[in-house]
């Protein structure tokens, strides 16, 4: 796995950064850069991560984020960095 971009969107509450960071740490996914912003009651975060030390397959990580999204009432998505950049190129 290469670098990936994780996006997190949800209603603002205490502990979102902790909850997402905990998942990453437990799976040996390193945060390279992080940006977060509040828009009214909505929390948004974009995280650039290095997944090279993660022992899970890309699909297993995607499935984990889908499961955790439901538990945490957040929209957590992960994309390959190159795909993310191509989709957001002007």
Curated annotation (Swiss-Prot):
Which PROSITE patterns does this one have?
Answer: ACT
CDD domains xref list: ACT_1ZPV (cd04872)
Supply the source organism for this entry. Neisseria meningitidis serogroup A / serotype 4A (strain DSM 15465 / Z2491)
Q: Which Pfam families match?
A: ACT_6 (PF13740)
Q: Which residues form the ACT domain?
A: 5-83
Q: Which cysteine pairs make disulfide bonds?
A: none
Q: Enumerate the SUPFAM superfamilies for this protein.
A: ACT-like
What protein name does the entry list? UPF0237 protein NMA1909
Give the family from UniProt: Belongs to the UPF0237 family.
